[in-house]
Amino acid sequence: MKKIMTIVALLTVTVSMLAQHDEGDFTIQPKVGLNVATLSNADKSIAHFHLGLEAEYMFTDKFSVGFGAMLSNQGAKYNATESLERYEIDLDYVQVPILASYYILPGLAVKTGIQPGFKMRAKAKFDDHKVDLDKLYGLYNNVTDDNAKVSTADISIPIGVSYEYKNIVLDARYCWGLTKVLNQGEAFRNRVFMLSLGYKFQLTD
């Protein structure tokens, strides 16, 4: 009996320490994390970072809507071919996630929504300056901005899960790109797994 009571007490303490938000709560969350990014036609993924701020409003104790702004570094790696040496594409976006979240348990939420993105920079890195770049994004130098052909906007669908404990939030989501990265030519799209750590500040009593 004592063991059962001890287990119950521990479970009670654990549950009470989980984040429980009430209807009408409004929070902001600075966050930083890792991107494992690729493009739909790429050979290899690439590790990059993201950082930003998200806000969340609880419509009920289980359902919330949130939005944010994040600087997200994305891209991919490509193996060497007969005409090109190996190269790496770097894409910087300001991503604006708009998410609906449902709390299955206190602190544990599943989420999805839509994520518009706005291109800030597009670069490519090559091992050899002598590679003919005319057929690849119109680039002619080792690292050059490609404003002519890379789409300025990106739309993706994020699907994820988050766990909150004492205001600390661990978030994992996968962003499935819908729009083409290039305005013309081959139709490849962003694919990004994001793992982040954040801290929630409650702005309402």
Residue ranges of each PLM-predicted region?
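Bacterial Sec-dependent N-terminal signal peptides
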Residues: 1-31, 197-201
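Outer-membrane beta-barrel channels and translocator barrels
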Residues: 21-23, 58-60, 105, 165-168, ...
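Residues that define the transmembrane beta-barrel architecture of outer-membrane proteins
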Residues: 24-28, 45-49, 90-94, 153-157, ...
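Residues on the lipid-exposed face of transmembrane beta-strands in outer-membrane beta-barrel proteins
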Residues: 30-34, 51-57, 69-71, 96-102, ...
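Structural signature of outer-membrane beta-barrel domains
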Residues: 35-39, 72-76, 117-121, 175-179, ...
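Flexible, solvent-exposed loop segments that connect beta-strands
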Residues: 41-42, 73-92, 120-153, 180-186, ...
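Glycine- and aromatic-enriched membrane insertion/assembly motifs of diderm outer-membrane
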Residues: 44-86, 90-94
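Helix-adjacent hinge/juxtasegments
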Residues: 83-113
